[in-house]
Amino acid sequence: MSKAAGGSAPAAESCPSAPAGASTPTGVDDLSKVTDEELLQWSKEELIRSLRRAEAEKVSAMLDHSNLIREVNRRLQLHLGEIRGLKDINQKLQEDNQELRDLCCFLDDDRQKGKRVSREWQRLGRYTAGVMHKEVALYLQKLKELEVKQEEVVKENMELKELCMLLDEEKGVGCAGSRCSIDSQASLCQLVASATPYVRDVGDGSSTSSTGSTDSPDHHKHHASGGSPEHLQKPRSEGSPEHTKHRSTSPEHLHKPRASGTPDHSKALKGPSPEHHKPLCKGSPEQQRHPHPGSSPEVLPKHVLSGSPEHFQKHRPGGSPEHTRHSGGSPEHLQKHALGGSLEHLPRARGTSPEHLKQHYGASPDHKHASGSGGSGGGSREGTLRRPAQEDSSSHHRNVYSGMNESTLSYVRQLEARVRQLEEENRMLPQGSFRLSSGADGNNSSLNSPASFSGHTTPSQQPEPVVHSLKVVWRKLGDAAGSCPGIRQHLSGNQYKGPM
């Protein structure tokens, strides 16, 4: 069409121009405005030219319109791309918005939970603070009480240490049978009474004299001839008749009250008559050595260390046939009652106190060392016969030791080990002395002398060191009982309340 227009344009130009006077369509802008009469007046060439010209104009308008449409389409494509991008961005923003909404909901729930937890925690904190305040106040009170108890225990331990030091000094001085040991013993008891709040019970078998023990040395001072240390040491070293008088240990002498003025009292001081010796010496050798449970010092630790009420019923004076059977002093009986732990059986079976034995059997330190080294090797036997204190694990001793601290417990166990050792020595000494007395003098000479009646022939074979050591041990136990409530309660729980 454009080619036709291009071809028609030169043709129109080549055509002869119309007459000037005629109305040509050159001046006409639009053919539509030309009427039909005017078109009929035109020639063919004019019509062709006007037609070609109108066609060219329309073609150019169409080209412009197509270009415009093309541009619009291009712009439309650009706008569509932008719209797609905006849609994607909007989708992403919507997703982000949803996530933010979920996060806000989660944070709000978490905030609500945090509020609830904080309220619960505050409530728990207030309750815990109140409980801790009460507990701390209670524990502070207990701590104060424990501090007071600790101070009391420390004070008691210091007093016990001082007491042990004084006892060791007294043992080192070694005034065996003299009055100085009794005086030092009285001073120690006064120290214990002033240092400890506990008062020693009456008749607990301790070293100090009491109103419950009628055979204490304060009541028997007039039994000894002189009462001086020289008088106590002289009869034991020389073996004079005065010595045999004071060595008399008949039951009448042990059970007689010291203030009686009857003639039997002077007889008890001089010793039993031969008629009284004969029925007692006709039995077995054990009966000659132990005519009565209160007549020989070796029975002392055996009867002292048994503390059951049944044993007390068996050994009361004037009792059942079991009493007479136990009074024979057989080795089985001695071994049976050798592992007790009470002091109250001493006045029951013996009828006397350790101070009474101290006046009759106490010896000087020189005599103690001489008889201990010459008898049966007592110095070397101390290490072999010493048994550890841990072997004594009976329920009886556990009850006694439950109220003691460690230092007092170890000290008392050492004393008990010493008692066992002295028991072994005491049991071995009379056997050798009885064999010597019966083999050397025959039957009549050994039965008629007061020394053979008690089971001892010569001063070197007498058990004064053993008896003195036993008295020292019992005195220490009594002093320890005054300072320790556990021992004191055990020793004074079963006091001798029968007639002396």
UniProtKB/Swiss-Prot annotation:
Keyword Nucleus set for record: no
Subunit annotation: May interact with ARVCF; CTNND1; CTNND2 and PKP4.
The keyword Cell wall biogenesis/degradation is annotated on this UniProt entry: no
GO cellular component: a single term: adherens junction
Top-level taxon in the UniProt lineage: Eukaryota
Gly residues composition-biased segments: 372-381
Function of the molecule: May play a role in cell-cell adhesion and epithelium development through its interaction with proteins of the beta-catenin family.
Amino acid composition bias (Low complexity), ranges on this chain: 1-23, 204-215
Subcellular location: Cell junction, Adherens junction
One Pfam family hit: CCDC85
Location of Asymmetric dimethylarginine modifications: 488
Coiled coil: 38-104, 132-171, 404-429
Protein name per its UniProtKB record: Coiled-coil domain-containing protein 85A
Lineage, highest ranks first: Eukaryota, Metazoa, Chordata, Craniata, Vertebrata
Biased composition (Basic and acidic residues): 231-254, 383-395
Residue span of region Disordered: 1-30, 200-405, 426-465
Alphabetized UniProt keyword annotations: Cell junction, Coiled coil, Methylation
Family listed: Belongs to the CCDC85 family.
